[in-house]
């Protein structure tokens, strides 16, 4: 309800002669029914991180655009991490500005921080990346390198908080899509060998490269 469709969805339903649930709706229905939290692949990832003392990295587009991801899905994963008792978990947030208004990103990130706080979670946001860098799909590797270095090599600028980093970008007339990847000071978020990574984008084409 209230989610914009597109030609692909229309053609698929017309061709099938029936309603074909898209990934967004299928995940929403799994959350509503309670089956999402027991999803085997999700539980396996959480268990591996917990039992082996590895850092859990959650990455994806923090947005309510509904094209590549949906923010409520991330909130559900945060809740699942809390229930599993994973001690070391961070979020690498990609900002939208393409399927949403150009500067809605800070509001979405504040909503995420509020959810984390309300659930007494120890999860922290470790880095923020504009989708221009983190979600390239056309082999523009010089773009992807900015995100890769922030994720794996402590590259990019550091800011005291998510808000200060995003506002700095806005002050430079840089909208959400083009935010140069930055890290949050004091948050250990580097991806190391044998760490566990969950990408919560339900559309796969723009996260294959990273």
Which positions does each model-derived feature cover?
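Active-site nucleophile/metal-coordination loop of metallo-enzymes that catalyze phosphate/sulfate
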Residues: 1-132, 142, 146
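Long, well-ordered, tryptophan-enriched scaffold segments
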Residues: 100-192, 196-198, 202-207
